[in-house]
Amino acid sequence: MPKRSCPFADAAPLQLKVHVGLKELSHGVFAERYSREVFERTKQLLFQGARAYRDHISSEDCSVNHLQESLKSGVVGAPQPARGQMLIGPDGRLTRCQAQASEGGLPRTAPIACSSCMRSVDGKAVCSQCERALCGQCVYTCWGCGALACVLCGLADYADDGEKTLCTSCAMFEA
C-alpha cells in the first residue's frame, strides 16, 4: 500500500534554517534603536573632534578678535568686508585669528613672493579680495571703491573712456 500524502501541504510553511545577522536586525526589528545609536555615536565623535581642535588652536596662543573689532581698521568711515579664514567661536559668532586681523597678516622675517609674478615683495600691498601679497607692478586699484586687487580678483573694463579695473564687489553692481 502506498504512503498517504499530507492533507495540509498548502497551509504549512517550509521550515528552513534562516541566518539572521546584524544587517538584517539593523534594517528590521531593531532599525530605530541601531540608527539612534549610530546617530549618537557620530554626534559624540563630531563634538569631541571640534573640542580637540578648539583646544589645539587655543594652545597655540592665537588670540581671537571679534568681527566688529577687525572691521574697525581700514578706510576712514567705510567698514571693510571680512576676508580670509574665519573661525566659529564657542559662542557661535564668527571670529578672526589675530595674525589675520593684523595689517596683511604677513610675517616680516622671510621674503614674500608676489602671487602673480613671483618677485620679492615687502608685504605692504595685499589684495583686498583674496589677501594675496602683490608687488607694485601687479597691484590694481579698483575704479569704484579704491580697493587693491590682484590679476585674479580684478576685472578689466574696456569702455569708451579707456581701461578701468573693478574689484569683484564693484563689478557686481556695474554689470
Curated annotation (Swiss-Prot):
Disulfide bonds: none annotated. Keywords: Apoptosis, Cytoplasm, Metal-binding, Nucleus, Phosphoprotein, Zinc. Induction: By p53, camptothecin, stroke injury and infection with coxsackievirus B3. This up-regulation is sufficient to induce apoptosis in neural tissue. Highly expressed in testis, heart, liver, lung, and muscle, and less in kidney, spleen and brain. Its main location: cytoplasm. Residues 36-55 are annotated as: Interaction with BCL2L1 isoform Bcl-x(L) and inhibition of BCL2L1 anti-apoptotic activity. This is Apoptosis regulatory protein Siva. It comes from Mus musculus.
